[in-house]
Regions:
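Tandem CBS (Bateman) regulatory domains
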Residues: 1-10, 50-87, 94, 99-103, ...
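Basic, Lys/Arg-rich alpha-helical nucleic-acid-recognition elements, primarily the DNA-binding modules
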Residues: 1-52, 57
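A glycine-centered beta-loop-beta connector
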Residues: 27, 35-52, 102, 110-126, ...
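Short acidic/polar active-site loop segments enriched in Thr and Asp
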Residues: 33, 108, 169
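Short proline/glycine- and acidic-rich turn/helix-capping motifs at secondary-structure junctions
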Residues: 177-184, 215-216
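Short basic, glycine-rich beta-strand/loop surfaces that mediate nucleic-acid
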Residues: 183-192
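Short, charged, intrinsically disordered terminal tails
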Residues: 206-216
């Protein structure tokens, strides 16, 4: 799944000399949590999160009056609070790669740049969640079950043969390999004839491996 299929392309960005006051307003007006900072050529030079804005803003306990606070927010620039040289991804990178980068670096979004380093989009944890929902077929309903099978070539074939026998339409298949030499297969299907057909299917799956759960 390439990032380009899931990223936001209509990206709100700012220049390095944009005031903190304007950055905060843009976040509020567009309901976003991060804004890339770009130079005159459109290349990404930084990123600002809503936390950066909060940390740089005067606290409620400040002794500054309203005019002093407004002056401070107007004078503080994006370049003063941004994270410089942020981690970026390419449109051709996968969503899985982007998710791993976000997880490992504890960030909620990544600018997407082309080969010249110019901003072409942004992908967030929210976009990753949407991709996951689509991959798993969660919106399509049906029956989902998980089965534990040996992590060996050919062990999944009897399962697919069984699904074919019951005329089950496969919506998604995900696998996770465990350290104990087994793998968990998460399968979502639909178009089974009735409840009895579902019960017969799960009984057959249980003969192939250990059924971990089954639910609609």
């Amino acid at each position: 799944m390439p990032v380009k299929n899931w990223m936001t392309t209509d990206v709100v960005s700012v220049g390095p000399d944009t005031s903190l006051l304007k950055v905060g307003k843009l976040m509020k007006d567009h309901h976003i949590r991060r804004i890339p900072v770009v130079d005159e050529q459109g290349q990404v030079i930084g990123i600002i999160s809503d936390r950066d804005v909060r940390d740089a803003s005067p606290s409620k306990a400040t002794t500054l009056d309203m005019y002093e606070m407004h002056y401070l927010l107007a004078e503080l620039k994006a370049k003063n609070i941004m994270t410089a040289k942020p981690i970026t991804v390419k449109p051709t990178d996968t969503v899985e790669q982007a998710a791993l980068i976000m997880l490992d670096n504890k960030v909620g979004g990544l600018p997407v740049v082309d080969e010249a380093g110019k901003l072409v989009g942004i992908i967030s944890d929210h976009d990753v969640f949407k991709a996951m929902v689509d991959i798993t077929g969660a919106r399509l309903g049906g029956l989902q079950f998980a089965v534990e099978l040996p992590d060996q070539p050919g062990t999944a074939r009897p399962l697919f043969d069984l699904l074919r026998t019951h005329n089950a339409r496969i919506l998604s298949v995900l696998t996770v390999t465990n350290a104990d030499g087994n793998r968990h297969m998460f399968v979502r299907v639909r178009d089974l004839e009735n409840a009895q057909s579902e019960q017969e299917l799960i009984a057959g799956v249980n003969k192939l491996g250990k059924v971990l759960y089954c639910q609609h």
